[in-house]
């Protein structure tokens, strides 16, 4: 089942570090089953509060493949520039739909 990596940039503190990340990150995808769907394209914040400076969505073949990329030596060496240059919210989301309402967000149920 596919998995989606979503990065939301919430603020930039050092653009030079971020530009280094942008330059050095694409080769880290080599050898991984990944498709970049969107990166830093125009967006609209429809709900909630920002700040949102930019959004990235990538599709991996599985959660395991995404974690393998995230922990790969190539990406570990590069991601330090992203972390130094900006504040991001990073999410890894399992693809698919939870059909049963009872199974959606079980952590939010009140305990009786």
Predicted segments with their positions:
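C-terminal structural segments of small proteins and small subunits
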Residues: 76-91
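Short S/T/G/P-rich N-terminal loop/turn motif that feeds into the first structured element of a domain
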Residues: 1-54, 61-71, 94-112
